[in-house]
Amino acid sequence: ASDNQVKSIAPTNVVRVEYFDIPPARYSQRADTVVNIITKNPEVGYSYGTDLTSALTTGFVNGSAYAGYTKGKNDFGLEYNINLRDYDNRIVNKTYEYDLNQIHYRSAEQQKDHFGYTYQNIGLRYANVDAGKYVFQAKLNMVLNSSFLKGIGQSIFTVDNTENLHNTVHNSNSNYTNPTLDLYYSKNIGKMDELSLNLIGSFYNTKSYQFDHEWRISDNTDIFNNDMNLKAKQTGIVGEIAHVHNFEKGKLSSGYRISNTSIDNDLINLVGASKYSVNYLEQYLYTEYSAKKNKFSYRLGIGITNIHNKSAETTQDDWAPTPKVVLSYELPKNQSLRFVTQYTSQSPFASALSSNVVQVIHNVVQKGNPFLKAQHQFKNNLVYSFSNKYFDLSATLFYNIVDKYFAQFYQLDAETGGYALTYENAKNYNEKGAQISGSVKPFGNNLLVLKTYISPTSMRLVSTKGTKYKSNFIRSNFALVSQYKDFTLSYRFNFPVFTLNGFFLSKDENQHHIFLDYKYKYWTFSTGMYWLGTPSQYYTKSLPGSLVQFSRQSHIYNNKNMFVLGLSYDFSSGKKLQIQKKLNNNTAPASTF
């Protein structure tokens, strides 16, 4: 269900809410959390609403609208969502430093740019439901997405001990249309069995353009020109069938899912023009048994995943088991203990596998790696939870290992004679640590609530050459929330830290946001301010030992003290059909690199 479908449910019609922070096998590799809302069935009903939040001084808009009508076994729905960003005051500072052919190079550039995007999603929905017998739903979505960047800058370019002043231009845009049809059918077979089917078809028509130019100011000599055009037509199909059999003391769930993405590329870049096709196929066969005895419950699952990626350069075929074990025990006084272990496979994303090449600076390009292999993840969690009038907290110990981890790094590039930022399957990657999350209510009510997330973590990466990199940090997010009658005041903040991201260290986005909401009947009025006293900040730098030493700091000054106003209206009356969609799939996202 979409956010708008959830909004359309009147609280008086909710029977119960089922929350799965460890989703069943059928959601494996697609969702970290699943929420199932069970509702009543009055006779006739309708719902409609709208939600709009906008900044007053810069381009920031989040909006949505929906309408639904239910009569008898039939449910009709219409939805629209828009997210718009248009920022014209971002300052980016970039440095590159490297040695090539016994010559030392350094580029220090400051760039000011204007960038943004517009995302729109229009959806039509029809459902036919006979409670306890069958569910049929058809959804047609059309996504319209566009983004742009216009930047100018200056750089001090140093060759050994000689400095020159350069001008730079960076322009890019990307847009795609994406119609998607999602068909779902579920039928109860007798009292103990249920069969579900899901079929999704989507099409992307994508156009991407990038132009980068750098030249020496003193004599207008070109340093480099990067002119890239990509047109891609992408077709995605996902099909899944699942069966559930209920035993007296347990439940057996089994299924098979297949997804295929085919992309036809028409590319012009700095190495010439080319037309090529790629195909990414993934299959997943699974079965899972779950049961509960007294205070002990368990889920035992086993499956197999096949990833078959084919490009002009190579064909990759990967088979891997996907076992999963969940053991839970209920302790006295609202306490519980749970252990989760699972092994999964993940295919490289399309841009990582791309054959495209774009110029970044003089002697440095960025490219994909068609020979990149699937990575395998082994995740382990031990979770302790407890709740009472004052506390609702979870403490987690985790240890995760990734084999053939996707990591970006710089390497010598024979094709261009310089360096290339590309992908490799690192030899090993692991992360271990602890996590404390939840809420504290000092007064035992919602007058004051502290929501917290604290996670001391250690990450370790081993490259294909055996070089070891390590990062230790404490990631955190906090929120202070006060609710009094129909007013809600909240303040969110964090302490940004550097975390390991491939062969780079990336800093968390800073947060200092304050919001005030007032609810009156079906209306909600809101106001607030993002990034109090500071612009949003982003910082990435390469690890020591990288062939190219890189750093990038950016600040978006448009959203410093960004004041927003919001208004929403949600009305719901009468019948709400109960649609428990047991299969939820998506095709691969657009390929834009």
Q: Which positions does each model-derived feature cover?
A:
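Outer-membrane beta-barrel transmembrane strand signature
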Residues: S437, K451-V462, K582-N585, P589
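C-terminal extracellular loops and terminal segments
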Residues: V17, A426-N430, L447-H513, D517, ...
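Surface-exposed extracellular loop regions of Gram-negative outer-membrane beta-barrel proteins
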Residues: D32, I37-D51, K150-Q154, S253-N260, ...
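Extracellular loop and loop/strand-boundary signature of outer-membrane beta-barrel proteins
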Residues: D51-T53, R106-K112, E163-N171, D222-N229, ...
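Outer membrane beta-barrel strand-and-loop segments of large Gram-negative receptors
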Residues: G236-V238, V278, Y284, K373, ...
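Outer-membrane beta-barrel translocator domains and adjoining extracellular loop/strand segments
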Residues: A31, N89-I103, L149-N164, S208-R216, ...
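Membrane-proximal, glycine/serine-rich, low-complexity loop/turn segments characteristic
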Residues: A1-S155, H170-N205, K233, I237, ...
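Outer-membrane beta-barrel transmembrane domain signature of Gram-negative proteins
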Residues: H213, I217-R299, S311, S328-P332, ...
